[in-house]
């Protein structure tokens, strides 16, 4: 869900069941400065969410907790434990580089921009108050530059 939505880890652990609109595939997020925004998620995230809600969460929800992600005792999952889960996956997959929750957020933003999203939309999805903050993610690959040039410049053909 971190990569699917681009949310911060602190936002992820504070998502409550009622924040999710499964019909629209949206999640209400309470971000930095207690600003509310809506993020969108796709079909892959929906499938994983369905499996978690139907299987894992039901077994974990011993305390009738409102939070989406629960620990083994039925309370809210901590950001520290999510970091541990990510670290464990990196080790299991034998990756030779570090991945953090922020890496997934950064990759979300970069992939959105590289696949045609405009900067203002990405700014809103990330919950940035300034476009300058979002500008960090605008490092564009040479392939992306060539692709956009070929598509958009009237004299690129030939």
Describe the residue ranges of each PLM region.
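Short, charged phosphate-coordinating catalytic segments
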Residues: 2-24
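C-terminal catalytic core of tyrosine-transesterase DNA break-rejoin enzymes
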Residues: 4, 88, 105-128, 136
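Flexible coil/turn residues that form the inter-helical turn or adjacent wing/linker of helix-turn-helix
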Residues: 5, 75, 97, 115
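Short coil/turn motifs that cap or connect alpha-helices
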Residues: 8, 16-18, 118, 129-132
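Short functional hotspots where side chains directly engage DNA or cofactors
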Residues: 25-30, 100, 111, 123-141, ...
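C-terminal catalytic core of Y-nucleophile DNA break-rejoin enzymes
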Residues: 31-51, 65-85
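DNA/chromatin major-groove-contacting recognition/catalytic segments
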Residues: 44, 51, 140-158
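Conserved hydrophobic residues forming the short capping helix/wall of the S-adenosyl-L-methionine
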Residues: 53, 90
